């Protein structure tokens, strides 16, 4: 048949018929088929970025309205102009908008441009503004005719009645914007180009479930794309209902307690909740952010995940304004610890865990054969070469813990005990401790507890961070990167006065020096001095504000760190060094240690149901496996040590429910914007109740100074979950008498005033001074 049509010259006219072309194009569109444009014969030099093309089209459109100057010349001039005010004034002039303010004119031009870019799709409505009030609606109806093409419609918009609560879980909405979103939603899922979609969090992950189906109107249009007649309509359909695992009351408590404690320790006043009073021992002047995670240890369901600062997702419901977006951002060079509202600390920030990691080291030691009852004497400190490693009790009081077994070492957070596990012996008396922990032992234990991978929560954007289990290769990689960054910034400053170098010469020198790390021990101080001198640098000049010259910095700060030695293990077993994990990863590790050894995939979703029928479309079933252990009693040994820690905490020991906790204080390098060194991260992890754990809790306070500061948050979470009638205080605790294991694990930096003598009776006055009701 085809050959017969071709022979009689019928095929080509049929294919090229406008009616047939329209039918084919319509069929393609209905089936979501968008034929690719063949550009293989085009010269790549003629290609341009979409943004540049759109800008040129914008200028060309408005240049055509200028009746005096040639369009081509206007476009060239506008493209070169960098001052947006000058461009706006020109556009106001040719559009006869000079009597309007810049803001009004910009609004008019924006609407005009939106209409122009519709092209042949003029029948598709353009959303000009959302959430207008009733008075505006009345003005539109009174002053604008129905035939003008402008109408007020009611459309569903996402509303978040609890505003900031769980914002990092829910995520936010926004219009389709990126090329990836156009490909994913417009081309593959038949979305309209200007639809609002989930951009982050659960909103993004479950976009297809939550969206439902758009209503449709079949219309006829004229040659300009204007709607002439509506042939048929089909109503929109609501999306599915999604139920989270989050306990709203617990989530609100976590956020409220986190905010209250951060404010109290930052400003040096008491924190009070319905469950008690907390008096900070000292100020933590830079404590402005933190996170709390609460999970069901028997299912892996996340019951609460708080991160501060947070944001109001209502700002994004119809597309966020530029000013609101900018208010949520921070300067790029403001430092890694500056509070960031858009950052979910709970799942995105992997930090050093401090002594909370001693529970992981304990599991590794027990698996290797440690007798938890065996006595090991703490001597306060030990020396490795010219470096001293202390227990905090020695640093602050000049005393020791004396005889310790594993339970006591966990309770007292005894660094010395864990140092001995890494050494295989007690250097104070030369006695063997029965086991010697190697790096691989730590790695195996950490991997069993899931610290090498994400927890599995259903948030694709922003992606959940993966922590870092220490390794020799990673240490060398990190050292090389740090040395490279240092040299790129500092090397030119050490150039001799009579020497000049090009950028490429500096780059070659940086590469050569970084390669010293391939064999760091062969690069003696003298060899480095000679190398730098030969390359035209002053190797011993100490710049203002620095403590060492170029050669000594390269040798002792970087090259010495490129060699793995026993001091690395001493840091790792107490949770320092290369260890870094997110709060939700640490939460899963604690849950696994206390639920009988089950490592669950974490989830934020309980179920998905059909909106109309309420039929269950998806019901979340716990996913987990039991980790391999030589003896499950090891888990009870670790739990018991954590119980002793809680019993030593004045606030938590008053609870009617027995719980287990582990504290941690982790040092971090760097400075705040005012030049003051970063304060420590404050950690606390725990579980409750002790006998048959139901929940795991992890808390981290950025620059929180001491883990003791997390006590009130832990109390509030436990009390809220178990609906306890309790009011506990730490009145009487001072810096002098509080248990060392509760204060922290590292020498602390004094920031701000000692506030231990603050009178609890002044609480009401403090609240009044801080604007509380």
Where are these regions (language model features)?
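A short, polar/charged loop-to-alpha-helix boundary motif
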Residues: 310-334
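Hydrophobic "anchor" residues
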Residues: 301-302, 599
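Second-shell loop/turn segments in exported
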Residues: 122-130, 155, 191-193, 237-246, ...
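Active-site beta-strand/loop architecture of penicillin-binding DD-peptidases
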Residues: 155, 159-161, 166-167, 171-181, ...
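Membrane-proximal periplasmic segments of bacterial cell-envelope enzymes
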Residues: 1-239, 243, 248-291, 297, ...
């Amino acid at each position: 048949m085809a050959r017969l049509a071709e022979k009689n010259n019928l095929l080509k006219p049929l294919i090229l018929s406008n009616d047939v072309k329209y039918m084919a194009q319509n069929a393609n569109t209905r089936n979501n088929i968008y034929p690719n444009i063949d550009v293989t014969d085009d010269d790549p030099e003629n290609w341009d970025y979409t943004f540049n093309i759109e800008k040129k089209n914008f200028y060309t459109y408005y240049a055509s309205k200028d009746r005096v100057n040639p369009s081509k010349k206007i476009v060239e001039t506008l493209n070169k102009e960098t001052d947006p005010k000058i461009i706006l004034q020109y556009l106001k002039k040719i559009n006869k908008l000079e009597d309007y303010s810049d803001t009004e004119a910009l609004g008019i031009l924006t609407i005009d441009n939106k209409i122009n870019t519709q092209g042949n799709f003029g029948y598709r409505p353009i959303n000009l503004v959302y959430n207008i009030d009733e008075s505006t609606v009345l003005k539109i109806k009174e002053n604008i005719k129905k035939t003008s093409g402008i109408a007020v419609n009611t459309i569903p918009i996402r509303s978040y009645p609890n505003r900031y609560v769980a914002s990092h879980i829910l995520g936010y909405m926004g219009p389709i914007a990126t090329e990836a979103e156009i490909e994913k939603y417009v081309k593959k899922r038949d979305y309209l180009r200007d639809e609002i979609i989930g951009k982050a969090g659960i909103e993004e992950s479950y976009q297809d479930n939550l969206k439902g189906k758009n209503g449709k109107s079949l219309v006829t249009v004229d040659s300009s794309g204007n709607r002439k007649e509506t042939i048929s309509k089909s109503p929109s359909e609501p999306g599915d209902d999604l139920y989270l695992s989050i306990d709203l009351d617990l989530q609100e408590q976590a956020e409220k307690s986190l905010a209250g404690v951060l404010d109290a320790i930052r400003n040096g006043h008491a924190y009070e909740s319905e469950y008690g009073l907390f008096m900070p021992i000292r100020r933590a002047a830079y404590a402005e952010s933190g996170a709390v995670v609460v999970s069901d240890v028997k299912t892996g369901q996340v019951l609460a995940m708080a991160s501060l600062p947070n944001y109001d997702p209502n700002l994004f419901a119809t597309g966020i304004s530029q000013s609101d977006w900018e208010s949520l951002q921070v300067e790029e060079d403001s430092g890694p610890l500056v509070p960031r509202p858009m950052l979910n600390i709970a799942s995105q920030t992997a930090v050093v865990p401090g002594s909370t990691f001693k529970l992981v080291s304990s599991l590794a030691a027990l698996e290797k054969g440690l007798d938890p009852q065996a006595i090991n004497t703490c001597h306060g400190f030990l020396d490795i070469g010219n470096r001293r490693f202390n227990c905090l009790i020695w640093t602050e009081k000049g005393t020791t813990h004396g005889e310790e077994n594993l339970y006591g070492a966990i309770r007292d957070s005894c660094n010395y005990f864990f140092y001995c596990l890494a050494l295989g012996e007690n250097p104070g008396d030369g006695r063997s401790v029965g086991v010697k922990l190697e790096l691989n032992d730590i790695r195996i234990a950490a991997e069993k507890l899931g610290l090498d991978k994400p927890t599995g929560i259903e948030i694709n954007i922003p992606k959940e961070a993966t922590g870092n289990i220490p390794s020799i290769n990673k240490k060398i990689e990190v050292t090389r990167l740090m040395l490279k960054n240092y040299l790129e910034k500092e090397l030119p400053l050490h150039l001799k006065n009579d020497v000049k170098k090009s950028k490429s010469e500096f780059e070659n020198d940086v590469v050569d020096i970084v390669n010293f790390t391939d064999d760091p021990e062969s690069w003696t101080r003298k060899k480095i001095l000679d190398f730098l001198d030969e390359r035209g640098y002053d190797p011993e000049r100490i710049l203002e504000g620095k403590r060492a010259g170029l050669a000594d910095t390269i040798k002792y700060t970087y090259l010495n760190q490129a060699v793995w030695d026993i001091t690395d293990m001493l840091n790792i077993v107490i949770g320092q060094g290369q260890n870094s994990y997110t709060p939700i990863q640490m939460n899963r590790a604690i849950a696994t240690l206390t639920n009988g050894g089950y490592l669950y995939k974490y989830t934020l979703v309980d179920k998905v149901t059909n909106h109309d029928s309420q039929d269950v479309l998806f019901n979340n079933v716990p996913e987990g496996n039991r980790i391999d252990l030589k003896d499950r009693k090891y888990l009870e040994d670790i739990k018991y040590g954590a119980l002793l820690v809680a019993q030593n905490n004045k606030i938590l020991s008053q609870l009617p429910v027995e719980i287990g906790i582990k504290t941690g204080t982790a040092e971090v390098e760097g400075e705040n914007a005012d030049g003051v060194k970063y304060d420590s991260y404050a950690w606390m992890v725990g579980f409750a109740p002790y006998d048959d754990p139901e929940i795991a809790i992890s808390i981290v306070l950025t620059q929180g100074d001491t883990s003791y500061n997390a006590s009130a948050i832990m109390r509030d979470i436990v009390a809220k979950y178990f609906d306890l009638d309790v009011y506990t205080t730490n009145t009487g605790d001072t810096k002098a008498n509080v248990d060392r294991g509760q204060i922290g694990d590292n020498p602390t930096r004094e920031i701000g005033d000692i506030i231990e003598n603050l009178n609890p009776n002044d609480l009401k006055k403090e609240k009044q001074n801080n604007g509380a009701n």
